């Protein structure tokens, strides 16, 4: 009998998306094929401690509006051996400090936001010589930072929306830029996700408060012109032989749903109040769907991505415009990425297996 592949599912983390990472991990733990994979669940506390947990999916769900999390009491504290000669070893930091608690073949970093999705854990895993699911250091960092995502997409000749970046030394948007952007605008942490810290601004006198909110999560802020149009999404998946495929296109509809006339897909709408309708496949012409799929793969290549990504679009009268790239999209039960692949004929367990197998085939180092 072939030995099962040992997969460390790493979740939680130090970012404001800690809870959503836990929910994604719970869904993944339910769907990894136990006949093929031996799961080693590793939680990261909001303070940054790594712990070996029991990995029970039911503890990683949103229950009656309460968000899950990882604490120091969730399990045994551990560290990843950074020496490639001890590749994949998880070492105890408890009473038996230095003992090997587990050794893994591959890491699935189900981490959203800074200190996980931004190239940091990817760099650690490269140093340790441990294969991992998803994008490498460069693509993870570029995909996390909306400023550099847009720069790379623009350099590749891909359509992006108008925007202004506010660095920590810059207090507000200039009058010239305000005139160009118009209203409304969306004010966001440049390196964040799950709509945390995001505001829709319809009057310029509300801009300072929106910038202050965004800067609670990131000192660098991006202010984006609103783009009228439908919200479409498309998944990209790399296979073990290196070829790429784009998924069925999906659509998120918020305006008019549960009173959300502003059409703002915020954190509560995404995760807590069922305030959006998800159409998979999207009700668009075949030509539009094919254009979106093609742009998704071009965007994936533009940031030198690997493994997987979800590319978000606005469908305007002039055609699709790329909003963001998510190099570790959500894997919750309502997340679009697995739903779009299911509609494309790849069920959840097969999708996860493909990602793990691709990570192992790719390995680490320059490639």
UniProtKB/Swiss-Prot annotation:
Matching Gene3D superfamilies: 3.40.50.20, ATP-grasp fold, A domain, ATP-grasp fold, B domain
Principal location listed in the UniProt entry: cytoplasm
A single GO cellular-component term on record: cytosol
Pathway listed for it is: Cell wall biogenesis; peptidoglycan biosynthesis
Give the E.C. number(s).
6.3.2.4
A UniProt-annotated Pfam family: Dala_Dala_lig_N
What are its cofactors? Mg(2+); Mn(2+)
Per UniProt, where does ATP bind? 178-233
Keywords recorded for this protein, A-Z: ATP-binding, Cell shape, Cell wall biogenesis/degradation, Cytoplasm, Ligase, Magnesium, Manganese, Metal-binding, Nucleotide-binding, Peptidoglycan synthesis
Q: Which residues are recorded as binding Mg(2+) 1? A: 312, 324
Report the superkingdom from the record: Bacteria
According to the record, cofactor stoichiometry and binding are noted as: Binds 2 magnesium or manganese ions per subunit.
The positions annotated for binding Mg(2+) 2 are 324, 326
Establish whether keyword Nucleotide-binding is in the entry.
yes
One GO MF term? D-alanine-D-alanine ligase activity
Q: What class of enzyme is it?
A: ligase
Location in the cell: Cytoplasm
Q: Does the keyword Transport apply?
A: no
The GO annotation for biological process reads:
cell wall organization; peptidoglycan biosynthetic process; regulation of cell shape
Q: So what family is this one in?
A: Belongs to the D-alanine--D-alanine ligase family.
Q: What does this protein do?
A: Cell wall formation.
List the NCBIfam families. Answer: D_ala_D_alaTIGR, PRK01372.1, PRK01966.1-4
Q: This protein is called what?
A: D-alanine--D-alanine ligase
Q: Gene encoding this polypeptide? A: ddl
